[in-house]
Curated annotation (Swiss-Prot):
GO cellular component: plasma membrane
Main location per the UniProt record: membrane
Subcellular locations according to the entry: Cell membrane
Name of the protein in its database record: Uncharacterized protein AF_0523
Residue intervals passing through the bilayer: 12-30, 40-62, 74-96, 106-128
Bilayer topology annotation: Multi-pass membrane protein
Keyword Transmembrane: yes
Keywords, sorted A to Z: Cell membrane, Membrane, Transmembrane, Transmembrane helix
Length: 150
C-alpha cells in the first residue's frame, strides 16, 4: 500500500472520530434547548467515546493498513475526544440540565482523572520528543573545537 493511501486512510479515521464527537456535542447543545440531555444519551455518549478509543487502539495494535497512525495523530485524536467529552459533560452539570446523581458524579470524577492523564501525556510526550530531537541533532553535529583553536 502506498504512503498516500496510508495517509488518506488515517485522515479518514481522524475525520470519522472527529465527526462523531461533533455530532454528539451538537446534539447535547441543541436538542430541546441549550444543554438539554437525559441519562440515556449520556450513556450512549460514553459508549461512543469508548468505542472510538478502542477502535484507535485496535488499529494500532493489529497493524492494519489503517493502523499506521503516527504518534502525533494518535495523541491528537485521544486528546480531542477526551477533552470534548469532559467539558461537554461538565458544562451540562454546571448548567443544571443534567442532574448530579451519584453515577454522574462518579463519571465526572473519572473523566477528570482521564482529562488530567491525557493532558499530561499529550504535553509530556511532546516535550520528551523535542528533547530527544535536540539531543540527537546535537550528537550528529558536534562542534569541532580543535579546528577553531588552530
Amino acid at each position: 500500500m502506498s504512503d498516500n493511501a496510508k495517509t488518506s486512510a488515517t485522515d479518514i479515521v481522524q475525520r470519522i472520530i472527529s465527526l462523531l464527537t461533533i455530532i454528539l456535542l451538537a446534539y447535547f447543545l441543541f436538542k430541546e434547548g441549550l444543554f438539554s440531555v437525559d441519562q440515556r444519551l449520556l450513556s450512549l455518549a460514553t459508549i461512543v467515546l469508548l468505542a472510538s478509543f478502542l477502535f484507535i487502539i485496535f488499529l494500532v495494535l493489529f497493524k492494519w493498513p489503517l493502523g499506521n497512525l503516527n504518534k502525533k495523530e494518535i495523541r491528537r485524536t485521544i486528546a480531542i475526544v477526551t477533552t470534548s467529552f469532559y467539558f461537554g459533560t461538565l458544562s451540562m452539570v454546571l448548567s443544571g440540565k443534567l442532574e448530579l446523581t451519584e453515577e454522574v458524579g462518579a463519571l465526572i470524577d473519572g473523566l477528570k482523572w482521564a482529562f488530567m492523564v491525557v493532558v499530561a501525556f499529550y504535553f509530556g510526550s511532546r516535550a520528551v520528543e523535542d528533547a530527544l530531537k535536540s539531543k540527537k541533532s546535537a550528537e550528529e553535529c558536534p562542534q569541532n573545537t580543535d579546528a577553531e583553536a588552530g
